[in-house]
Amino acid sequence: MGSVDSLLKVKDIVGHQNEPVIVVVSALGGVTNQLLAMTEQALSKDSAYEATLALVADRHMDIISHVVPADRQAECREFVGEFINSSLAGMLRMLCLNDVPADIVEDMRKSIVSFGEILSSAIVTMMLDATPRFAPGFIKTKRSGGEDVLDAELTRRLIKSEFGGSQPPTTVTQGFIAHDAATDKDTNLGRGGSDYTAALIAAALGATALEIWTDVDGFLSADPRVVPEARLISKLSFAQAEDLCNGGAKVVYYPTIAPVRDSRIPTWVKNTFRPDVTGTLIGDEMSTEAVVGVTSKDDTVTVVTRVDADLALLADELMRRLMSEGIVLIPVARTPQSVTLRLLNGQAATVVPLMHKLLLEHE
């Protein structure tokens, strides 16, 4: 959600739904990074954060003027302006002018980074004339191993309670942000957590489907930035999707798959800007392609196939063919539908185009 055009596309997509929908929104594109940058500037006693804050405010106000109906703009501007110029500015000013203890800084950082979703959800709620819901009221985390992790059972119960009974035509809530179950402090589900929030809600409610609208057509057989001829994967099993995400595909935040897999919720990944493109359906049925896709992360490459593929034979063939190009790979992990290979003498991303070509030949 980075522009007026994308938000108007969201409005059109929601308007074509024939049953009640819950819309889970992320921050406007780039805003989370700006919030983090302003926090660090303020901690460094650098007043340059004020210029970025003004840019953030201007951008939100400009979007309001283009997407929110005229009769609701004043209310939306008042909320967004108060939140930015009072709440957000006040926290940044406190960090800039005071020596704040480290534990409080961490709490404030989590609060500041949550503002992006709160602001965008206010705009989308007003744009759609929807019913708002505050996600931290039902998305809960707990401390484990020094980190904030989802309190899954509590979250599931609270979602059922929050959304029990008849639903309004359109509900809007925030992705990513949460509250600690014990302290009620601001926390979050990690970058990419908006997909995860949507999956948790869909799973808890037994939704008809989960639709993840993004800026690509769906899952592709490789990263199109390095393999321009990468093809759209029309269908994936939950396990195949998990392996692609775990192997480096960034289309969907990796933890998103587990809740919908466990509850058997069909999940579509589609392009906001090209809604007529079929997209990728993630469900019980696996892709019919012998070789589904290849992804890379750090120094590893993961190849995802059908379950009935001979992975050992495929891995041996890939290693033999690539060794003739001076590229050495060793197998390091395997699932029923994937094999992960470690690259010993270079970066995995540079190997992906060649491997993709070899895999297509293998078919």
List the predicted regions and their residue ranges:
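Nucleotide/pyrophosphate-binding catalytic subdomain
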Residues: 1-252, 337, 342-347
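Short phosphate-binding/catalytic loops that engage adenosine nucleotides
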Residues: 19, 265, 327
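Glycine-rich beta-alpha junction loops
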Residues: 28-29, 216-218, 271-275, 286
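Short gly/pro-enriched beta-turn/loop segments at secondary-structure junctions
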Residues: 205, 262-264, 296-299
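A conserved active-site cap/scaffold subdomain adjacent to cofactor or substrate pockets
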Residues: 235-283
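A conserved regulatory-domain signal marking ACT and ACT-like small-molecule sensing domains
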Residues: 278-363
